[in-house]
């Protein structure tokens, strides 16, 4: 309880009222990292970059977990449950002036009351299986994400997204399923070449009240008529 983490300038990077994790020992002996649960409650994280030449104040944490050791074991991570409650995160690029029009500023973000519930079933070099059961965020300039959920399973040559839902105060987006397939990219291929070989199909239902996005697009402040869309889409390589 009451965990404090300082950055290299001796400023508070993170303060958590409660931080807990439970690690499964037996999988660790087999070269796997299996964490039963991670809990982070009542937390404030202050992230910043003081100048264009300076590194972000959290860079030293990323450097700690990075490695140039090519003989290390392949990535194999499982986290049974991730719980975040009452988490506030700020991000400031300190040399850039703040916007004054009351809209969201990506250089000076303040995210409040973040709540998250997720299950990372598998994370390997060639696969990802994650279930997001809850994500809610309030942004200081008025944007509110009431909830976001999805199930994502990605392998070497295919991916599947199920139960993708976004809920705003007066809007919703529902994608029951997206299925996609692709060829493994060659070592000399680029992103554009790879994306041209992706096949995809799915369904989408959307009801959007533009004023829900007024903190991003100010002209939407007076838009009070909902936009409704139901569609099936297919992309063939």
State what each model feature region is.
Residues 162-165, 203:
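Transmembrane beta-strands of outer-membrane beta-barrel proteins
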Residues 158-161, 237:
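Repeated loop/turn-to-beta-strand initiation elements of outer-membrane beta-barrel proteins
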